[in-house]
Amino acid sequence: MKAQVRTLTGEIAHEIDLPEIFREEYRPDLIKRAVLALQSTRFQPHGTNPYAGMRTSAESWGSGRGAAQVPRLKNGSRVARVPQATGGRAAHPPKVEKILVKEINRKEKRKALRSAVAASTYPDLVRERGHLFEGDLPLVFEDRFEEVTRTGDVIAALTALGVYADVERAKGSRKVRAGRGTMRGRRYKQRKSVLIVTGGEPLRAARNLAGVDAVAVDQLNAELLAPGTQAGRLTIWTESAIRRLEEFS
């Protein structure tokens, strides 16, 4: 299995043999588990005060008075403490001791990563995610791409490769999130576009492009390759990143 290595102007420089990882079996079930396990590590434990709603001297009147046997305040008939009362405790509040992290076996996690890498070369899966691209997959740049320092040069290279339309798609997808997340630092939602994987340092010049993630090959994980648990992200590799992928096989 071979791939064409492109120059920064989009011309074919030469061909490269792809490592065994690109022949990995597609396992969407493992990919989903690996992504959910990663996401669960970012959950923050939270819980209510155990005394919330309990700070009252209310007591039940007992039987024989024709009223419900619930705790009532001393100076009247107002109900307190129970979940159905105003100001009462919560019925089943969140608890800090709840185990939030989802575990996954080490071998399953590694297989999920290999499977997600292979899935990034399936044109049908990539298009199903909504990505826009031209040519065959995988997309590979020569190592000079890692030396680019200006965002304008990155845009020119992506345009020559025929994938900048996908960045524009992500740029136009930004919208205000529905729900309480708007008050919690998550006001906007935006689609993911290109993932740029380099052999050395991450490509800093691509950080401000809409929906683009730039990482070193040793920082790869299932969530980067399958955002939202859906595999087939449009991925651009450098030649040195492809060579280092042999360590994952």
Curated annotation (Swiss-Prot):
Protein name per the record: Large ribosomal subunit protein uL4
Subunit structure: Part of the 50S ribosomal subunit.
Keywords: Ribonucleoprotein, Ribosomal protein, RNA-binding, rRNA-binding
SUPFAM superfamilies: Ribosomal protein L4
Gene Ontology MF terms: rRNA binding; structural constituent of ribosome
One Gene Ontology cellular component annotation held by this UniProt entry: ribonucleoprotein complex
HAMAP family documented for this protein: Ribosomal_uL4_A
A matching Pfam family: Ribosomal_L4
